[in-house]
Every structure is written in structure tokens, then in C-alpha cells.
């Protein structure tokens, strides 16, 4: 029985949309524009330890579409998940929280953003898959490796 208690454990407790905002500062006139919009996408990942083995992971997506110099829409969504992570070596928690958890959450974020854009009256925008491992490694390089694993799963 004690062997079972020491087994690595990873569980999704909840996935939820934490926040979403949509702005259309130039509607309805923007709907008359014939030019294709330019689209910028930004993604960020944050993690917070809620309890000894429980983490909230937050994947934020910001999509800005512009026609010429006018903003067609700006949408920001924060997709969150609560994950229970137990009996995982400390040096493996940060990559799990920074790579695996965001990879699980991103399809929900992508769906919520696409739905909001369509409901706002714009053509659908499908966000491409994101390589969260590359994003994680880039973040580590920017931090210069400073206490990345020592943060014990909390990335900022």
C-alpha cells in the first residue's frame, strides 16, 4: 500500500475559462473594409502553486487584428487548469508545469478564442499549434537558468 502512495501522480482537477475580453473599437465601420486584416498572436504561460501538490496553470492568448492602422478586434483570453502533481521529482515539476500542462490547456483556449471571434462577426481565425517545449526552453534561456528548477514549478 505504501508503494501505491509513492507512485507518480498527475491529475487534471479542473479546466476553465478564467477571463476573456473582446474589443471592437472601430465597428461597425470596420466590417465595410475590403482589405485583409493583419493578425498578431501572443501566448504566455504562468503557474501558481495553490497547495503543496496543486498548481493553477494559466495560458493567456492575445489576438489583435488590424486593417491598415485600425484595430478590427482585440481579444484576450485566459484558459486555466488546476493540476494535482504528486511524487514527481522536484527537477521534473517545472517542465511538467511549463510544457505538459499548457499543451493540455491550449486546445481549449484556441476553441474559446475562435468561437468569440466568430460570434463577434469576423471570419474565423484558427490559431496554430504551439511548441510549448520550445517556448519553455526559450524562457529558461532568457532567465539564464536562474533558479528555473528551484522555483519548483512556478514560472512567471
Swiss-Prot record:
Keywords: Chaperone, Cytoplasm, Protein transport, Translocation, Transport. This is Protein-export protein SecB. Homotetramer, a dimer of dimers. One homotetramer interacts with 1 SecA dimer. Transmembrane segments: none annotated. The keyword Chaperone applies. One of its GO terms (biological process) is protein transport. One of the proteins required for the normal export of preproteins out of the cell cytoplasm. It is a molecular chaperone that binds to a subset of precursor proteins, maintaining them in a translocation-competent state. It also specifically binds to its receptor SecA. It holds the Pfam family SecB. It is found in: Cytoplasm. It comes from Paraburkholderia phytofirmans (strain DSM 17436 / LMG 22146 / PsJN) (Burkholderia phytofirmans). GO terms for molecular function: unfolded protein binding. Belongs to the SecB family. One of its GO terms (cellular component) is cytoplasm.
Amino acid at each position: 500500500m505504501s508503494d501505491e502512495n509513492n507512485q507518480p501522480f498527475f491529475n487534471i482537477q479542473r479546466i476553465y475559462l478564467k477571463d476573456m475580453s473582446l474589443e471592437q473599437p472601430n465597428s461597425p465601420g470596420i466590417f465595410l473594409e475590403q482589405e485583409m486584416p493583419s493578425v498578431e498572436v501572443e501566448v504566455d504561460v504562468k503557474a501558481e502553486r495553490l497547495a503543496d501538490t496543486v498548481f493553477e496553470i494559466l495560458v493567456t492568448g492575445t489576438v489583435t487584428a488590424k486593417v491598415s492602422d485600425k484595430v478590427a478586434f482585440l481579444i484576450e483570453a485566459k484558459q486555466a487548469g488546476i493540476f494535482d502533481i504528486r511524487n514527481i521529482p522536484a527537477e521534473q515539476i517545472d517542465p511538467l508545469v511549463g510544457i505538459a500542462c499548457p499543451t493540455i490547456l491550449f486546445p481549449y483556449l484556441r476553441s474559446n478564442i475562435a468561437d468569440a471571434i466568430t460570434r463577434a462577426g469576423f471570419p474565423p481565425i484558427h490559431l496554430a499549434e504551439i511548441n510549448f517545449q520550445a517556448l519553455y526552453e526559450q524562457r529558461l534561456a532568457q532567465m539564464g537558468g536562474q533558479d528555473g528548477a528551484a522555483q519548483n514549478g512556478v514560472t512567471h
